[in-house]
Amino acid sequence: MKKISNILLAVTFALPLFTACETDNDSNPILNEPDTFTLNTPAYAANNVYDLKNAQTVELTCSQPDYGFPAATTYTVQASFEQDFIEATDESKANYTVLESTSPTAKINVDASELNNALLDLWTAVNGEQAELPTEPVAVYIRLKANITSSGKGVCFSNVIELPNVLISKSTSSLTPPKTMFIVGSMLDTDWKVWKPMAGVYGMDGQFYSMIYFDANSEFKFGTKENEYIGINDNRVTVTDKAGAGVSGSDNFVVENAGWYLFYVKAAVKGDDYQFTITFYPAEVYLFGNTTGGSWAFNDEWKFTVPATKDGNFVSPAMTASGEVRMCFKTDLDWWRTEFTLHDGEIFYRDFNLIDSWTEKGDGYSIQGSAGNVIHLNFTAGTGEKK
């Protein structure tokens, strides 16, 4: 077997995330639709082995697509064993794999385990279930897809780069992403007896979310099952506070600032255990679709008002047109991954491949709105209504 040396644990693409801002003039920016953008070849790619089993991340860097103005951009990693990426047709599958995790910046820390598993699946798809995995490094080709965040606009693809020495390995762990996630704490009940189940992010195994009101200095823990009690001091846990919640603690999580937050948990398999990433997002709920006159982006004109109390209602702006009501939370993901509706007066979180309408789920899942209607949502009670 070829000796593996100089194991590279990170590969590099870099560029800060630019976001649109107001200018001194009243003109609207004009969207340029670029054909491509530059993905950088790592400086030492030719002489190093990317051992995905023993690496943590593969770091990539690229230039931002030229949209004609600074725009928040989402990057998706695609990988193939062939230099020419071939799209799927009615007769054949695509010859590349797409990683589920995306990046909001042009410096992308690709999870090595996720890349390894994606390449394993692609190898099996190309060579058959009985095909042996190569014991020596193989060439892997990478490209990026970019689009303007939370929209279908500005889609373009980077150039293809080669990583000539990538070692992929069979997973030695039988652990799979958790199917459930719960949160418990003083903001739910003072006796810590209520284990609140969280909604699963559609299409993202091991990821969960819940809109929760935290009293000032609330304390809580979470778990993949009831009575697991995972705290902030667990070395498997990292916390990102994007909402100014003021998260701290030495055992229990402590939320300093009272208010509504979207609590988000990502559980990733790392060997024989999980790594948990906790994110606090602002409590942002939006109307989408036909009842807004056709808005399919996070437009603050269609953001719900946030109540000041635990038992208050989130209230939508008045609809301006007729059609099916579409609602979602704002995270770093595509809007439809955290979409929900109302069914028999209760909030129902998307759990299926919705193509065009909630009618595909069954009777009573599609809310039909008209001009002047508003939606009231009570996330503490888990209920809602159209008025």
UniProtKB/Swiss-Prot annotation:
Residues 1-20 form the signal peptide. One of its GO terms (molecular function) is starch binding. Pathway: Glycan degradation; starch degradation. Changing W336A: Impaired binding to starch. Abolished binding to starch. D-glucose binds at R326, W335, R350, D351, F352, N353, L354, I355. It comes from the Bacteria. A lipid is attached at C21 (S-diacylglycerol cysteine). One of its GO terms (biological process) is starch catabolic process. Belongs to the SusE family. This is Outer membrane protein SusE. The gene is susE.
